[in-house]
Amino acid sequence: MKKLFEKIKAFLDIIFFSLKLTVQASPKYFSFYILLSVFVIILPFAVIYVSSLLIDLLAGVSENSVRHEMIKSLAVLIVSLLFLNVMSKTVESIKLYLEGLYNEVITIKIKHQIMEKAAGIDLYCFDSHEFYDEINDASNNSTFIIQISFQVLDFIRYFVQFCIAFASLLFWNYILPFFLVISVIPSILMKNKQLESVYSFQREHMKDERKIYYIMNMALSREYAKDIRIYNLFPLLSSKIMNTWNHLYRSKKKITKKYTKILVAADILPEMTTIIILFLLGLSVIEGSGTIGDFNYYQGIIGQVIAGLYMIIYNYGQIYDGK
């Protein structure tokens, strides 16, 4: 329990540090970014809702329907859907443009902080190699700090998006949404675990990767070309590369195969839960307590819940591992 609280505290410290950095870098850009994020959160739900209204309209067409009224309603919904989709694309483009500018502002802010810190240090520190190691480390990690800062903002956005989608499902049923979340978590955790395992494997075997590239560079280098031909060294170089590559390939294959088997089983759980929910939604339509539009609406909401939960856990892992 103590370790859990320590992890939560460490994660919250990262969030507060990142938010403080992004706000201090440019309050104006931060405000614009938050405003655009709000639109990014709301627009998918608006599209899902309008789509459900459109389906209800088309499903309710009958011989007794007033033709011109139906056409008018259809036109309004189609135009609304077009407007929302265009707005969604526009907001995403503006957000991407703003991220590029915001990135530059945060970068210069971090560099300025490094300079400010160095300016306040005693002169004798400049004679120490440890000082320059720290400065180089801070400079090299500045890009990573910026990446984490944007991931924190994304984490908050996906969390809010998930909460809205989850609350929408609760309006339909108080129990099944919890089962949906519980069924999705193992699959997401295993996917992240697989990525972490492959990444850790690659880090552990960087020496072997460098060995392969070094031998390849030797074989392609003019400097060694003559010796390779005179002493017939190509078979030796080739065998070294293939032996090293085969070892890496078999090891990586073993890791991915192990997690693939687990993922196959884990991916079944959310699909089964989703099918049960859709079946119950279908029954409500047949019994008359729901509409076809409701079926489409909640199907979209389920997708938002699953996608939001996946991105929350993914960004959490990226942020916490990069602390």
Residue ranges and their predicted role:
Residues 36, 80, 84-91, 153, ...:
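Physicochemical signature of membrane-embedded alpha-helices that form the seven-helix bundle of GPCRs
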Residues 223-236, 255:
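Pre-NBD coupling/linker segments of ABC/ABC-like ATPases
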Residues 31-91, 168-198, 272-279, 283-296:
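Transmembrane helix-loop-helix hairpins at lipid-water interfaces of multipass membrane proteins
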Residues 47-54, 95, 99, 114, ...:
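Hydrophobic/aromatic residues in alpha-helical transmembrane segments
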Residues 1-44, 63-77, 95-99, 116, ...:
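Membrane-integrated ABC transporters
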Residues 233, 277, 298-323:
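Cytosolic ends of transmembrane helices, especially the final helix of ABC transmembrane type-1 domains
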Residues 97-116, 123, 179-223, 239, ...:
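Cytoplasmic coupling helices
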